[in-house]
Amino acid sequence: PAIIKETGLCVWKSGKKPYLILKRNGDMLKGKMALYYTGISHDTPSYVKNNRDYNLLARSSRLAYTGVQNNNLEQLCTGINMNYEVQLKEGMNTLPVIENVIATKYCGGGFGGYILSVFYNKIDRDKFINNYQHLSAIKIEPYLNEM
């Protein structure tokens, strides 16, 4: 199981031992995020050997990082959507089009599980939550736990 030691909007450098590069309070995402369940379970380790477009994945990561660094929601969401393009190229199912979503992608390893959607504002996000209760849609908020 995952143990969350860092809160806020974090950028991690991946590798054998990931490390934290940048941490923000995440206020630019307040009132704008939702999670919902696809209804499909998944087994992330079984996808490890799949072909990946590492160039596109790296570009999406750099763009999202720049968005966090600049506190720019549009840049961050462009990076998220580019990551979703990688997921589609890997064979994941196309996600439903949801009104007023800036960005969307599978969480974690994808191929089922949870979906993250970022909306323009709290009104659009909350409308989605109310309309998609059958998908167990929930709002999520960034928070920063200062220790």
Task: Identify the function of each model-found stretch.
Residues 2-109, 116-147:
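C-terminal nucleotide
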